[in-house]
């Protein structure tokens, strides 16, 4: 049996998903492909890594197999019996560009196991199983957006998701005359995982200081009671949530000019208040600002490298792409990687 699960790109709502905030992602047309069959022991094969790993029972190896093993462990924790299987994976999802290849692998595994063994796990439960694999087994304290999008994605739509209640709404993504590109900065600073966890701690500090249970209870007035770093972090989360709401409205009205401006202001906030951008992604966004037909751009993902999402009029980005490549190479000695992004449905059999 074969399945595929998509990556995702988040239009706006960065570093809000673990703060009970709003996000606006869509599933993209790049996938993790996975096949599953019965076996004497657990065998996991990755075409991309060109490696096969065998094990008698599920164990943590601190490598790519943990995403698969973690999902199996999540099923077993819930009382499902997963007998040994051979799982083979391949992917055309770029790693480290902010398209969430790990969540796609987790969701592909969860869906394949549910279908293969006839568990018929509901969609939302699949999301939770996949996320639990990353948080508890792999050990990355991610929010729920990535796994949610890989399961619930719908072609030609973005998902307006409230990460606190998990209520969601499909918002039509009518891009006629416009396009979305992803520019991969081709850098990943070592800080990324340690700083990501530090931002989470800082946000928890904010709640402790304000004696609130959730960021949803935090108001603009509360910012007055904070100072320094904590104030900056809280201000980003509050304003980014507002930007998501405005972006949903703009998408519904087909107002891409407004959406573009919101992307630029999101980047400024991630740079100045949340302090997770880096010289390379700042350079890309600054370069694009004011160029003809470019409506907006911002860093995507955890930060400290990774990708930049670009919203433009159709064809406009292609005209300045070469200049951008040259300028970036001259400045950093690194080649950019480009991905034109289209929307996709969520996980499915193939």
Curated annotation (Swiss-Prot):
<feature type="binding site">
    <location>
        <position position="46"/>
    </location>
    <ligand>
        <name>ATP</name>
    </ligand>
</feature>
<feature type="binding site">
    <location>
        <position position="134"/>
    </location>
    <ligand>
        <name>Mg(2+)</name>
    </ligand>
</feature>
<dbReference type="GO" id="GO:0006012">
    <property type="term" value="P:galactose metabolic process"/>
</dbReference>
<keyword id="KW-0067">ATP-binding</keyword>
<dbReference type="InterPro" id="IPR019741">
    <property type="entry name" value="Galactokinase_CS"/>
</dbReference>
<protein>
    <recommendedName>
        <fullName>Galactokinase</fullName>
        <ecNumber>2.7.1.6</ecNumber>
    </recommendedName>
</protein>
<keyword id="KW-0299">Galactose metabolism</keyword>
<dbReference type="GO" id="GO:0004335">
    <property type="term" value="F:galactokinase activity"/>
</dbReference>
<dbReference type="GO" id="GO:0000287">
    <property type="term" value="F:magnesium ion binding"/>
</dbReference>
<feature type="binding site">
    <location>
        <position position="196"/>
    </location>
    <ligand>
        <name>substrate</name>
    </ligand>
</feature>
<keyword id="KW-0479">Metal-binding</keyword>
<dbReference type="InterPro" id="IPR019539">
    <property type="entry name" value="GalKase_N"/>
</dbReference>
<keyword id="KW-0963">Cytoplasm</keyword>
<dbReference type="InterPro" id="IPR020568">
    <property type="entry name" value="Ribosomal_Su5_D2-typ_SF"/>
</dbReference>
<dbReference type="Pfam" id="PF10509">
    <property type="entry name" value="GalKase_gal_bdg"/>
</dbReference>
<feature type="binding site">
    <location>
        <begin position="96"/>
        <end position="102"/>
    </location>
    <ligand>
        <name>ATP</name>
    </ligand>
</feature>
<keyword id="KW-0418">Kinase</keyword>
<keyword id="KW-0547">Nucleotide-binding</keyword>
<comment type="pathway">
    <text>Carbohydrate metabolism; galactose metabolism.</text>
</comment>
<comment type="function">
    <text>Catalyzes the transfer of the gamma-phosphate of ATP to D-galactose to form alpha-D-galactose-1-phosphate (Gal-1-P).</text>
</comment>
<feature type="active site" description="Proton acceptor">
    <location>
        <position position="146"/>
    </location>
</feature>
<dbReference type="InterPro" id="IPR000705">
    <property type="entry name" value="Galactokinase"/>
</dbReference>
<dbReference type="InterPro" id="IPR014721">
    <property type="entry name" value="Ribsml_uS5_D2-typ_fold_subgr"/>
</dbReference>
<keyword id="KW-0808">Transferase</keyword>
<dbReference type="InterPro" id="IPR013750">
    <property type="entry name" value="GHMP_kinase_C_dom"/>
</dbReference>
<dbReference type="Pfam" id="PF00288">
    <property type="entry name" value="GHMP_kinases_N"/>
</dbReference>
<feature type="binding site">
    <location>
        <begin position="14"/>
        <end position="17"/>
    </location>
    <ligand>
        <name>substrate</name>
    </ligand>
</feature>
<dbReference type="InterPro" id="IPR006203">
    <property type="entry name" value="GHMP_knse_ATP-bd_CS"/>
</dbReference>
<dbReference type="Pfam" id="PF08544">
    <property type="entry name" value="GHMP_kinases_C"/>
</dbReference>
<feature type="site" description="Transition state stabilizer">
    <location>
        <position position="8"/>
    </location>
</feature>
<keyword id="KW-0460">Magnesium</keyword>
<dbReference type="InterPro" id="IPR006206">
    <property type="entry name" value="Mevalonate/galactokinase"/>
</dbReference>
<dbReference type="InterPro" id="IPR006204">
    <property type="entry name" value="GHMP_kinase_N_dom"/>
</dbReference>
<dbReference type="GO" id="GO:0005829">
    <property type="term" value="C:cytosol"/>
</dbReference>
<comment type="similarity">
    <text>Belongs to the GHMP kinase family. GalK subfamily.</text>
</comment>
<dbReference type="InterPro" id="IPR036554">
    <property type="entry name" value="GHMP_kinase_C_sf"/>
</dbReference>
<keyword id="KW-0119">Carbohydrate metabolism</keyword>
<feature type="binding site">
    <location>
        <position position="102"/>
    </location>
    <ligand>
        <name>Mg(2+)</name>
    </ligand>
</feature>
<dbReference type="GO" id="GO:0005524">
    <property type="term" value="F:ATP binding"/>
</dbReference>
<dbReference type="InterPro" id="IPR022963">
    <property type="entry name" value="Galactokinase_bac"/>
</dbReference>
């Amino acid at each position: 049996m074969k399945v595929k699960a998509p990556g995702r790109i988040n239009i706006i709502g960065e570093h809000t998903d673990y703060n009970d905030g709003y996000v606006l992602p869509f599933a993209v047309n790049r996938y993790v492909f996975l096949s599953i069959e019965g076996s004497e022991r657990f065998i996991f094969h990755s075409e991309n890594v060109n490696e096969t790993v065998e094990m008698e029972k599920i164990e943590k190896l601190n490598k790519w197999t943990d995403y698969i093993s973690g999902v199996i462990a999540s099923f077993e924790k819930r009382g499902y019996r997963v007998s040994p299987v051979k799982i083979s994976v391949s992917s055309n999802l770029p790693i480290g560009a902010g398209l969430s290849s790990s969540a796609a692998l987790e969701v592909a595994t969860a869906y394949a196991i549910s279908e293969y063994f006839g568990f018929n796990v509901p969609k939302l439960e699949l999301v939770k199983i996949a996320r639990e694999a990353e948080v508890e087994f792999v050990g990355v304290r991610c929010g729920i957006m990535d796994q949610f999008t890989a399961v619930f994605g719908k072609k030609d739509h973005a998902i307006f998701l409230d990460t606190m209640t998990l209520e969601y709404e499909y918002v039509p993504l009518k891009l006629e005359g416009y396009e979305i590109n992803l520019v991969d900065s081709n850098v990943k600073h070592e800080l990324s995982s340690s700083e990501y966890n530090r931002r989470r701690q800082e946000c928890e500090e904010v709640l402790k200081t304000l004696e609130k249970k959730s960021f949803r209870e935090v108001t603009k007035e509360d910012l007055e009671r904070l100072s320094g770093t904590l104030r900056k972090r809280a201000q980003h989360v509050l304003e980014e949530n507002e930007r998501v709401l405005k972006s949903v409205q703009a998408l519904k009205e087909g107002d891409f000019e407004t959406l573009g401006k919101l992307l630029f202001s999101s980047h400024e906030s991630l740079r100045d208040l949340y302090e997770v951008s880096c010289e390379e992604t700042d350079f890309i966004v600054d370069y694009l600002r004011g160029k003809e037909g470019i409506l907006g751009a911002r860093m995507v993902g955890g930060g400290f490298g990774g990708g930049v999402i670009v919203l433009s009029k159709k064809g406009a980005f292609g005209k300045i792409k070469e200049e951008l490549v040259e300028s970036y190479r001259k400045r950093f000695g690194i080649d950019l990687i480009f991905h034109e992004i289209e929307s996709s449905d969520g996980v499915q059999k193939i």
